Amino acid sequence: MTHTRVISTWTELTRDLAIYLLFTFFAIKVFKFLFSCNRTSEISSFSMATHPEALRRERILNSKLYFDVPLSKVSIIYSSSYDISFMGIEKLHPFDSSKWGRVCKFLVSDGFLEEKAIVEPLEASKIDLLVVHSENYLNSLKSSATVARITEVAPVAFFPNFLVQQKVLYPFRKQVGGTILAAKLATERGWAINIGGGFHHCTAERGGGFCAFADISLCIHFAFLRLRISRVMIIDLDAHQGNGHETDLGDDNRVYILDMYNPEIYPFDYRARRFIDQKVEVMSGTTTDEYLRKLDEALEVASRNFQPELVIYNAGTDILDGDPLGLLKISPDGITSRDEKVFRFAREKNIPLVMLTSGGYMKSSARVIADSIENLSRQGLIQTRPE
């Protein structure tokens, strides 16, 4: 009996030991697997952190800002969310923050555009903005005082930031989405107009001059990767120097910058001027004929020096005679001629063109922009009705 009991006990111990060893074996395997996965993840995260270009690429490829636009829509991008209305304090800045909606209303009422044919963009997300902007810069916009400095509307500093995000920065983010989408539309259809955008004073690290996000820089980085564009020309004809995109892209030989601006007004960014490939300075009081002559010469030089696959045209109307900030004396017809010249420049060379409306600080700017777009339609340079 005792002998049998010993054998039984030994058998149980042997079985328990086998189970223990088997359990330990599998536990070690699982631990090694989990450690390996965690290590791979850490390496991957470290790799992403140490390779910002890889992270930028991932963000661009995963973005939803590019989407297919049906042929029932034309290449004009706008959202009612573009317009900024913030308890009336937006009127403290000379910029007409409702001009974008007024441009579209003119085009519709004049019979050149149907509301249902307008393309509405998506809002640029934080991940989209991080393609160019730093986390620190985007976090700085959580301060209403920072946004007040950028928009040059001091009372904004006293409002809760959630209101500032909704009433000021959200419209800007929608316009950024419009600029980025415009490049895709332009490559598909030859041209696209974002009735907004052109925030050419904002760099990756700093906003200013009513420009909170660097939509031109973002648009170009998206185009490089998603559209396989290798050469982009920026034609910046806003009255002010485009120091934002110059700072961000000036040392990139894939980008050629033609900037025609008044050097006697903001932003006086002498460092950024070094990055301009073709600098055309027009002094305060420059009239229409002289301006258009200089533009013709500039476009001729640009066509000899660079062969772009995409043109970003920053078509500010602050060159208009009477504009309180631009200080130039260009007539409304002069702006129409200017826009037509740039569109013909691109059409003759079969280059897709993106137009952004940028600056313009008079109530009459909306009417002038609409008239110019209508002229482009009459000249057959754009098509404002669906095919």
Curated annotation (Swiss-Prot):
Q: Which Pfam families match?
A: Hist_deacetyl
Residues that bind Zn(2+): D238, H240, D318
Cofactor(s) required for function per UniProt: Zn(2+)
Spell out the Gene3D superfamilies in the cross-references: Histone deacetylase domain (3.40.800.20)
First-tier enzyme category under EC? hydrolase
Sequence segments annotated as region (Histone deacetylase): 73-382
GO cellular component terms listed in the entry, alphabetical order: nucleus
Q: Is the keyword Membrane assigned to this protein?
A: no
Q: Active-site residues?
A: H201 (proton donor/acceptor)
In short, the EC number is: 3.5.1.98
What's an example of a GO molecular-function annotation for this chain? histone deacetylase activity, hydrolytic mechanism
**Key words, A-Z:** Chromatin regulator, Hydrolase, Metal-binding, Nucleus, Repressor, Transcription, Transcription regulation, Zinc
Concerning InterPro entries, the annotation shows: HDAC_classIV (IPR044150), HDAC_PDAC (IPR050284), His_deacetylse (IPR000286), His_deacetylse_dom (IPR023801), His_deacetylse_dom_sf (IPR037138), Ureohydrolase_dom_sf (IPR023696)
| Textual note on the cofactor | Binds 1 zinc ion per subunit.
Extract one GO BP annotation from the record. chromatin organization
Top-level lineage group: Eukaryota
Spell out the CDD domains in the cross-references: HDAC_classIV
Site note Polarizes the scissile carbonyl of the substrate, residues: Y361
Compartment list: Nucleus
Entry's family note: Belongs to the histone deacetylase family. HD type 3 subfamily.
**Job of this protein:** Responsible for the deacetylation of lysine residues on the N-terminal part of the core histones (H2A, H2B, H3 and H4). Histone deacetylation gives a tag for epigenetic repression and plays an important role in transcriptional regulation, cell cycle progression and developmental events. Histone deacetylases act via the formation of large multiprotein complexes.
Q: What is this protein called?
A: Histone deacetylase 2
Tell me the classification of the organism that encodes this protein. Eukaryota, Viridiplantae, Streptophyta, Embryophyta, Tracheophyta
